[in-house]
Design a protein with these regions (language model features):
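Amphipathic, positively biased hydrophobic alpha-helical segments used for protein targeting
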Residues: 14, 65, 95-97, 121-124
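Local cysteine-cluster metal-coordination motifs and their immediate loop/turn environment
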Residues: 56, 79-115, 138-145
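FNR/FR-type flavoprotein reductase catalytic core
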Residues: 1-82
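Iron-sulfur (Fe-S) cluster-binding modules
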Residues: 9-12, 18, 40-47, 105, ...
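Residue-level recognition of conserved structural "scaffold" positions that shape functional pockets
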Residues: 10, 61, 91-93, 120
């Protein structure tokens, strides 16, 4: 399953030579009109495991879909990685559990990932991230003691 904004698809032909392929485009110029979830539903596709990469809003939707369908889901996160070894914490994402390295609810995308089981990480919207930063909290605890 591949999703694109429009007909400017890439790798579709190459990937299609290895497996059956469904395509969704937001404008409907190729394949199903809409998101990858629209195509999955329209074509009645099923899976035991989902592997996803792409923009955060899409990953949030895939994560929610997988949880509702009881499907194991792995997501690949894209973050800027300053040091690449986990020391600077510049690539952290919010996580469900406390990280042993930093003692906060973060995962280091460069060191712990970039691929995570979907329910291990929180996929915050830009607004949610902004609210946490303005509140002075990047650890996910929002100043609350456990």
């Amino acid at each position: 399953m591949l999703g694109y904004r429009d007909s400017q698809t890439f790798l579709a032909e190459e990937i299609g030579t290895y497996a059956g392929l469904a395509i969704a485009t937001e404008d409907g110029s190729v394949g199903t009109k809409g998101t990858v979830l629209d195509a999955i539903r329209e074509q009645g596709l099923t899976a035991d495991v989902i592997y996803a990469c792409g923009p955060t809003p899409m990953l949030r939707a895939i994560k929610e879909y997988a949880a509702g369908a009881g499907i194991e889901c792995w997501i690949s996160l894209e973050e800027r990685m300053a040091c690449g070894i986990g020391a600077c914490l510049g690539c952290v994402c919010h996580s469900r559990d406390v990280d042993e390295h930093s003692n906060v609810r973060n995962k280091r995308v460069c060191k712990d990932g970039p691929v995570f089981l979907a329910d291990e990480v929180e996929l915050l919207s830009t607004e949610e991230q902004r609210e946490r930063i303005q509140g002075g909290c990047m650890c996910g605890s929002q100043g609350k003691e456990d």
